């Protein structure tokens, strides 16, 4: 297998977003199976340049630092994605990538449909209610069955951090302003 280019960590794009990980080799011709972190893997398909980093959990890998992986093709297969990359030509090479974390530039994501948002764009947004009362900032989002839930962090007395959960549905969310870094909701602080 030809050596994959090793990039300096500074070469990871500033807008890089972790979108999945390589699960295992798939077949004998260098294909590998990817577990995307999203139900919609379009971000993986839209970028032909994936940046890999070794797993934080210590998966064995032949590389350290950041590796640029030029993608020949990627497609959905069952509940995952399979991909083929330049320089990964056999099963052994694909197995060497097992556990690697996949990053793509946020700028390569396809445009979201109206009233749809990438979770990564919502993290850190300030959430206020209709009266302008600050409820916290989005720390994470949870897929809770039929809906997504915003998990907010807010300061409490004594320096502790509080947590608030708000369903991310139109019944409670009035407006999302990505550019203004704000979400307006129909919610009260004491809910």
Swiss-Prot record:
Domain PRC barrel: 114-191
Location of the protein in the cell: Cytoplasm
SUPFAM superfamilies for the chain: PRC-barrel domain, Translation proteins
Biological-process GO terms, alphabetical: ribosomal small subunit biogenesis; rRNA processing
InterPro entries given in the database record: PRC_barrel-like_sf (IPR011033), PRC_RimM (IPR056792), RimM (IPR011961), RimM_N (IPR002676), RimM_N_sf (IPR036976), Transl_B-barrel_sf (IPR009000)
Protein keywords: Chaperone, Cytoplasm, Ribosome biogenesis, rRNA processing
Pfam families linked: PRC_RimM, RimM
GO MF annotations, alphabetized: ribosome binding
A cellular component annotation (GO) from this entry: cytoplasm
Primary location recorded for the protein, binned into one broad class: cytoplasm
Gene3D superfamilies linked to this entry: PRC-barrel domain (2.30.30.240), RimM (2.40.30.60)
Family under the similarity heading: Belongs to the RimM family.
Subunit structure: Binds ribosomal protein uS19.
Free-text comment on this protein's domains from its UniProt entry: The PRC barrel domain binds ribosomal protein uS19.
Purpose: An accessory protein needed during the final step in the assembly of 30S ribosomal subunit, possibly for assembly of the head region. Essential for efficient processing of 16S rRNA. May be needed both before and after RbfA during the maturation of 16S rRNA. It has affinity for free ribosomal 30S subunits but not for 70S ribosomes.
HAMAP family from the UniProt entry: Ribosome_mat_RimM (MF_00014)
NCBIfam families from the UniProt entry: 16S_RimM
Protein name in UniProt: Ribosome maturation factor RimM
Organism: Paracidovorax citrulli (strain AAC00-1)
């Amino acid at each position: 297998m030809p050596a994959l280019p090793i990039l300096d960590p500074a070469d990871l794009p500033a807008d890089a977003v972790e979108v999945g990980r390589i699960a295992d080799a798939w077949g004998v011709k260098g294909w590998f199976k990817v577990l995307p972190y999203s139900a919609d893997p379009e971000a993986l398909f839209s970028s032909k340049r994936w940046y890999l980093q070794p797993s934080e959990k210590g998966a064995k890998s032949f590389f350290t630092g950041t590796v640029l992986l030029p993608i020949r093709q990627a497609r959905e297969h069952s509940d995952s994605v399979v991909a083929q990359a330049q320089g990964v030509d056999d099963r052994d090479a694909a197995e060497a990538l097992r556990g690697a974390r996949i990053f793509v530039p946020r700028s390569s994501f396809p445009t979201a449909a109206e009233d749809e948002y990438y979770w990564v764009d919502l993290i850190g947004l300030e959430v206020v209610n209709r009266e302008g009362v600050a409820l916290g900032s989005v720390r994470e989002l949870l897929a809770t069955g039929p809906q997504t839930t915003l998990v907010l962090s807010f300061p409490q007395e004594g320096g502790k951090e509080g947590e608030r959960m708000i369903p991310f549905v139109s019944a409670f969310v009035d407006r999302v302003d990505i550019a203004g870094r704000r979400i307006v909701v129909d919610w009260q602080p004491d809910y």
